């Protein structure tokens, strides 16, 4: 783990990367609202698709890479999420008029107080 080793003492959480967390760990099962990035390696892209589809529908699914790639096309066609966002992390906050409020387990149906 890379980050602030004294986070519990000063109550500040610096951006933190957790390498290869257990698939059963809280960081892999719960929604994370903080500067935490779990990084988990996969042997092949089939395993990525299987992992996504074996869990509840995500509020958002972030893809970093070429949107014309076969992998992006597979994510788009073979998975389901509240939003599929490519090469961006703040898309939902860019325009307050976007009618996005989530789906599935974490969705609440409305956004921006409307």
Predicted regions and their residues:
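Short beta-strand segments
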Residues: 1-4, 62-64
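Short, solvent-exposed loop/turn elements at beta->coil junctions and helix N-caps
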Residues: 2-8, 89-90
């Amino acid at each position: 783990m890379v980050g602030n080793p004294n986070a519990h003492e000063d109550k500040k959480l610096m951006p933190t990367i957790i390498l290869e967390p257990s698939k059963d760990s809280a960081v892999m099962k719960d929604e994370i609202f903080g500067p935490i990035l779990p990084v988990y390696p996969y042997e092949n892209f089939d395993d990525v698709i299987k992992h996504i589809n074996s869990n509840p529908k995500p509020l958002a699914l972030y893809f970093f890479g070429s949107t014309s790639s076969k992998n992006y096309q597979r994510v788009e066609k073979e998975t389901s999420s509240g939003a599929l966002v490519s090469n961006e992390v703040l898309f939902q906050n860019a325009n307050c008029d976007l009618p996005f409020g989530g789906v599935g387990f974490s969705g609440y149906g409305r956004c921006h107080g409307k």
